Each structure stands twice: as C-alpha cells, then as structure tokens.
C-alpha cells in the first residue's frame, strides 16, 4: 500500500529537471550507496539525456523505470535493469527514496511495483544487491519477498571503491519456459 499523497508512475520525457532537483537535494543522502557522480550528473540536461536513454530501453522491452512523486516532485525512483532473456529471463532492480520520504514503506511499495511489472514482462526472477551495511535496504527486499542468496566480493564500485554486496533474488513463478520465447528474446 502506497502512503497517502504519493504516486508511482512511469518515467516520462519531461522528468529530467525534476530528477536533477531530486538528485541535488539528496546528494548527501545517496552518496554512501551510489557511484561517485560527476557534477554534470546533477543537471537537468544530463538527467534529460538519461531519461531519453532509459525510455529507449523501456520501449525495447529491456527494462522499466518509474518515479515516486509527491506534490509534483520526484521523491524516489525504481528501475528494472539488465534484462536478460533466453533461458535466464531475469533482471535486477535498483531503487532509492529521498531523505525526507524514508520510513513510510515507499521503497517497499516501489520494489513491489517493479516486481509486478517484471512479471508482466514475463521474467522468471529479479535480483538485487545492497551494500553490507545497508540494512534498511535489506529489510525492504525481505519485505518484498526476496531471499538472501549470498555475498559478492567487490561487486560494485560505490562511493569511490569496490564494495562487497549482499545479493538477493525473488523468483516470480515456476512455469516452464516457452521454447518460442527463449528463442526470440
């Protein structure tokens, strides 16, 4: 259930400026969990380019992107990334919630929304990773039905260094893979 006044909607062409503002406002809040970003990342122009790139991925059926909005401002974001078809039928999920919006179940709602969309795309599983110390994000994943599957050493370059991550997965269904789907995608 989404907290009152919030909406999760698909990323849209005009979202670049609002995303840039959200990233600027949450720069310190997100810094421990994000890659080191160049200054240009925080501009409306850079975010508009990123939005256009993501929308191409979405249009190709290779991912999904949604924003959490309150009062017309971006309060968070969730993406389905790295869609792999064939015999894997998998994707990864990434998400963040702005500092002023934490503790309301919003991250869990966004992840659950992405899982519903992943099922619509016909995916079998979704994976996620968190830094070892990011216990709030680990709780989000467990609440959304993910299971912990292990530790990946030096998994991602976050906050200026290679960092270990706890890996999670959520299996969406146990149906057999349609051979025509595996061959086409």
Language-model features: locations:
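GNAT-family acyltransferases
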Residues: 1-92, 98-100, 162-163, 167-185
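Conserved active-site tyrosine of GNAT-family acetyltransferases
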Residues: 141, 146, 168
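Conserved G/P- and acidic residue-centered "switch" motifs that form tight phosphate/ATP-binding loops
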Residues: 72, 105, 122, 134, ...
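Conserved acetyl-CoA-binding loop-helix of GNAT-fold acetyltransferases
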Residues: 95-97, 103-116, 120, 135-143
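Conserved GNAT acetyl-CoA-binding A-motif
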Residues: 120-130
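Conserved catalytic-core motifs of GNAT/GCN5-like acyltransferases
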Residues: 129, 147-164
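Conserved beta-strand edge residues that scaffold enzyme active sites
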Residues: 37, 132-133, 155
């Amino acid at each position: 259930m989404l907290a009152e006044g919030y909406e999760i909607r698909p990323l849209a062409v005009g979202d670049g400026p609002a995303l840039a503002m959200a990233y600027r406002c949450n720069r310190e809040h997100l810094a421990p969990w994000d890659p080191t970003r160049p200054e240009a990342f925080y501009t409306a122009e850079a975010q508009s380019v990123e939005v256009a790139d993501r929308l191409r991925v979405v249009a190709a059926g290779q991912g999904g992107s949604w924003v959490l909005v309150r009062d017309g401002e971006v309060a968070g974001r969730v993406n389905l990334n790295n869609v792999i078809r064939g015999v894997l039928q998998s994707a990864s999920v990434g998400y963040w919630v702005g500092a002023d919006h934490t503790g309301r179940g919003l991250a869990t709602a966004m992840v659950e929304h992405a899982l519903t969309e992943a099922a619509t795309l016909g995916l079998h599983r979704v994976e996620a990773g968190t830094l070892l110390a990011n216990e709030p994000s680990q709780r989000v994943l467990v609440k959304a039905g993910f299971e912990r599957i292990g530790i990946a050493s030096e998994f991602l370059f976050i906050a200026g260094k290679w960092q270990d991550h706890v890996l999670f997965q959520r299996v969406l269904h146990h149906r057999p893979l349609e051979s025509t789907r595996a061959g086409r995608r």
